[in-house]
From Swiss-Prot:
Record carries keyword Ribonucleoprotein: yes
Protein's GO biological process: maturation of SSU-rRNA from tricistronic rRNA transcript (SSU-rRNA, 5.8S rRNA, LSU-rRNA)
Recorded coiled-coil stretches: 261-326
Gene Ontology CC, one term: nucleolus
Name assigned to this protein: rRNA biogenesis protein RRP36
UniProt-listed PANTHER family: RIBOSOMAL RNA PROCESSING PROTEIN 36 HOMOLOG
Length: 427
């Protein structure tokens, strides 16, 4: 009786609402007072235009109780429950007219959606009391389930997302296991890439195998479309192998025979300039002179002296090379004469060649004109004598245990006498 009374009060209170609120699609709320312990508010969902309804012919037209009604087909209901309800509603043909109100209320409550609450509000107390108690309990259970389903929508979305991720991970795991099982014949199977392509490319089947690298290289933004033109290098055709072939020294000496005179003239001018600057430095730029003019004179004299030494060095090098060519030419002529005479050619050693060069040098000094040639020869001989004497002295000191050589120990070290200890050193 408590359930019927609460249902009656709820329908009566909901009937006072305006039709405008019904059109706006607001949900009707019902208070379920079945139990004494707790009270629950049940939300009813509005009717959608595209929902499926089936007209019931019995009592729809020509009935004394009022207009027709529509039945909502709920796909969530079980087949057994629908069959049982159909059997209870249509099982008794004799009480069909009397239980018309009961069937109408039962269908609306059984669907779980109280969409025609304004029709139920017009029912009398007798019509509400005629509904069986178990059907009211069933309607309350269905409405609770619908309400719980609406509140759990967000949780279901989260659970659905997590389930999708779990299924995806499970599929990846199965694919990997299938790949490993298919390549189980090899000793060290090559695993497919899991995290990144770089780690997969860096992996190798064997430690001695070459590293695998990607052939895709990024194109540089600074591309050199047109190559720069190389600067033309100047070349002298007189000494170029493309035009003149190998250099003929004899032909070159004959063609440029005037160059030695120019070299001698240049050296003479540098010597005169150096002597003049040296006299000027003595008179105007002494060692104590600190003026700017004195510094300029010193710098100019040092520069001319450096140029003179460089010119003399180049001239001495040219003279030495000319002397070597002359000595080689003499040996070549001698070998040609020996071959013509039927003798074997003579190939001098390095020491013999150096001796011939030294003899040639002294002959040139002796053949000079005037007293200067004899003086230069005498100076050269004295310089050679001093050099040889210094060599003999070093070799004699080394033999006696002195000198700068350390590979030969002194004679006194070979004596049997013990060496004296240093001061303060214990024996």
């Amino acid at each position: 009786m408590h359930l019927r009374d609460s249902t009656k009060d709820t329908l009566a209170s909901s009937g006072n609402r305006d039709d405008d609120e019904i059109d706006d699609g607001q949900h009707a709320q019902f208070l379920d007072a079945d139990t004494v312990d707790s009270e629950e508010s049940i939300e009813a969902e509005p009717v959608e235009e595209n929902e499926e309804w089936s007209d019931q012919g019995s009592g729809a037209e020509g009935s004394d109780e009022g207009g027709g009604y529509a039945q909502y087909i709920d796909p969530d209901d079980d087949i057994d429950e629908n069959d049982e309800e159909g059997m209870e509603v249509s099982g008794n043909d004799e009480e069909e007219n009397s239980d018309h109100e009961e069937v109408r209320i039962l269908v609306l409550l059984n669907s779980g959606y109280i969409t025609a609450w304004y029709i139920l509000a017009q029912c009398t107390d007798a019509e509400i009391e005629s509904v069986p108690y178990d059907k009211l309990l069933k309607a309350r259970r269905i409405m609770r389930r619908q309400s719980a389903r609406g509140h759990a929508t967000d949780e279901e979305d989260d659970n659905e997302h997590e389930s999708i991720e779990a299924k995806r991970d499970l599929a990846k795991k199965k694919l990997r296991e299938m790949y490993l099982s298919s390549h189980s014949s090899s000793s060290k199977p090559k695993l497919p890439p899991t995290s990144s392509s770089s780690s997969f490319l860096a992996s190798r089947e064997r430690k001695n195998a070459p590293a695998v690298m990607s052939s895709r290289r990024p194109v540089s933004r600074l591309r050199q479309v047109v190559k720069p033109i190389q600067n033309a290098k100047a070349r002298d055709p007189r000494f170029d192998s493309l035009s003149a072939g190998p250099v003929n020294l004899d032909l070159h000496a004959k063609s440029y025979g005037f160059l030695p005179d120019l070299y001698q003239t240049e050296i003479k001018q540098l010597r005169d300039q150096h002597a003049k600057l040296k006299r000027t430095e003595i008179h105007h730029a002494g060692p104590r002179a600190k003026s700017q003019q004195a510094a300029e004179i010193r710098d100019q004299r040092a520069h001319v002296e450096q140029e003179l030494r460089r010119a003399e060095s180049r001239q001495n090098e040219r003279t030495r090379r000319e002397r070597e060519r002359s000595v080689k030419a003499d040996f070549k002529k001698e070998n040609q004469r020996r071959v013509d005479a039927g003798l074997k050619p003579f190939f001098p050693k390095k020491a013999q060649f150096q001796e011939a060069l030294l003899r040639k040098q002294f002959d040139e000094m002796a053949q000079g004109s005037g007293t200067g040639s004899s003086a230069s020869l005498r100076k050269a001989m004295d310089r050679k004598r001093r050099k040889d004497a210094q060599k003999e002295k070093k070799s004699l000191d080394a033999a006696l245990g002195g000198g700068s050589r350390t590979d030969i120990r002194p004679m006194r070290h070979f004596s049997d006498a013990p060496r004296p200890h240093k001061r303060g050193r214990r024996g």
